[in-house]
């Protein structure tokens, strides 16, 4: 009988009701994501209609997009002022593990993700890992952060053994647990 059931849209299904989006590029005009405030507000409006309750805005920070925490915070304040909805907005960043990240880590100039401020959303090149990946991850941990690897499915060069040296220091892969 299942082929004859009434089809539902995602909105009708309630699938996203109470949902938290932990990684998006909705903060306007800061990276390769949303470019205008109107577009950001339109997306947030659609999120509201779907029942999303919380969004973590995670713009890129990398040598090719050297956003500063001050600039991102200023853009975030602008979005908060323009957005009149009920979704809780939070600011973090998606950090490329490059030389700029190393500088920012040394200065503690970071935008962590999660209410406790102890997790860093990180990424690497899709083609090659950083030459010192294991030590970079260990330095992140030594600074009191837990790395969350964005897009692990894209790193075809990685396998389970690449995660072994830091697996006991809470390298976080996709999970349904709360951050």
Name each region found by the language model.
Residues 1-86:
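An N-terminally biased module of ancient metal coordination in phosphate/nucleic-acid-related enzymes
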Residues 24-28, 55-60, 121-123, 147-152, ...:
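Short beta-strands and strand-loop turn motifs
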Residues 169-175:
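Conserved small/polar residues in nucleotide/adenosyl-binding loops
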Residues 68-168:
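Extended substrate/RNA-proximal surfaces in nucleic-acid metabolism proteins
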């Amino acid at each position: 009988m299942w082929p004859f059931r009434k089809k539902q849209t995602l909105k009708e299904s309630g699938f996203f009701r109470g949902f938290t989006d932990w990684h998006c590029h909705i903060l306007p005009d800061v990276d390769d994501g949303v470019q205008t405030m109107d577009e950001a507000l339109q997306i947030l409006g659609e999120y509201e209609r779907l029942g999303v309750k919380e969004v973590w805005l995670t713009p890129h920070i990398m040598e090719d997009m050297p956003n500063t925490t001050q600039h991102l915070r200023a853009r975030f304040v602008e979005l908060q002022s323009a957005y009149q909805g009920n979704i809780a907005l939070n600011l973090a960043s998606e950090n490329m593990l490059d030389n700029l990240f190393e500088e920012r880590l040394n200065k503690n100039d970071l935008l962590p993700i999660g209410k406790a401020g102890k997790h860093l959303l990180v990424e690497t090149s899709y083609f090659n890992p950083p030459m010192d990946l294991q030590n970079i991850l260990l330095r992140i941990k030594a600074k009191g952060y837990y790395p969350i690897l964005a897009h692990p499915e894209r790193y075809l060069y990685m396998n389970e053994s690449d995660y072994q040296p830091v697996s006991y220091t809470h390298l976080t892969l996709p999970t349904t647990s709360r951050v």
